[in-house]
């Protein structure tokens, strides 16, 4: 299983719609204002995805219990903004700007960007399995005792694409994975 390079990622994004919208290079400055950004777009061996303006932040207003088998949105407040302030030692869900369509012979691994990691924000994204498609639900943990700011429409994590030595027998789409074609921030369900 080998990691795929920028030329392959570009070709698959342009010809097969693997990533939409697709930034063909690392974007480090806002195209209109020139303001510095947390980079996103194509890199040497991956693609830095962006976080959208949609966030769901954990709150304890209703004294909810977090149960992955019976999750309730009472534990979350929805935010649509250019920034999201994650409270100390708290957690947020978000979604990617980009929509992904993963080929049958590819598996991805997603790693949080070092800019956020060095601020105590840990980004978790589960692998994109063969033939999975949708917007990515992104999990962000603020491990610090301070509030932390996350910027919408800027880079949040890097996606690495690995091509299998052989094609899998059953893809995510064929086994009717529960998060197939997710559109917004998708909460857990069993």
From Swiss-Prot:
Record Pfam families: DCD (PF22769)
GO molecular function, a single term: dCTP deaminase activity
Keyword Hydrolase applies: yes
Matches recorded under Gene3D superfamilies: 2.70.40.10
This protein's pathway: Pyrimidine metabolism; dUMP biosynthesis; dUMP from dCTP (dUTP route): step 1/2
Catalytic activity: dCTP + H2O + H(+) = dUTP + NH4(+)
Enzyme Commission (EC) number: 3.5.4.13
Active-site positions on this chain: 139 (proton donor/acceptor)
Statement: the UniProt record of this protein carries the keyword Protease: no
Keywords: Hydrolase, Nucleotide metabolism, Nucleotide-binding
Superkingdom field: Bacteria
Swiss-Prot/TrEMBL GO biological process terms: dUMP biosynthetic process; dUTP biosynthetic process; nucleobase-containing small molecule interconversion
Function noted in UniProt: Catalyzes the deamination of dCTP to dUTP.
Similarity section: Belongs to the dCTP deaminase family.
Complexes and interactors: Homotrimer.
PANTHER family: DCTP DEAMINASE
Protein name: dCTP deaminase
Species for this entry: Chlamydia trachomatis serovar D (strain ATCC VR-885 / DSM 19411 / UW-3/Cx)
